[in-house]
């Protein structure tokens, strides 16, 4: 078996185990997202890429969504929701973003790999993705690969829940797609 195939199998199996997550927290996340006046999303590095993909889908759902750090992003205010994606939950800018959001009266949804992190403690809603430390992880899924893959899949599941809650369809989302596919 090739290393690529072995790595892919390992990643898929690991992510499936990691996503045996609590459905209650997902429902809380959906309520927070659909109730927010505006949704602001933040993450750094590969977690930031996952966050951007999530922000894109929320925009396609018709939600007023922004990525924190862009020059055209408005300020976060009370009634908004800040979604922060961070594996460690201790990235300084992620924790600061959550604390500032709370200070101005916005809600915070944290997607973290560490349920006991500073970011998780600063959040109103926590989607915790726990990773089992396996010997093969370093060889087949280095650094934060498993968290990033799992968080992307989990957030795509949240998108499906928000879609249902808002009565959206793929067709209505397509009409908001940047490329108008």
Predicted segments — roles?
Residues 3-5, 29-30, 72-74, 130:
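Short, flexible segments with low predicted structural confidence
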Residues 38-153, 159-160:
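Glycine-rich phosphate-binding loops that contact phosphosugars or nucleotide phosphates
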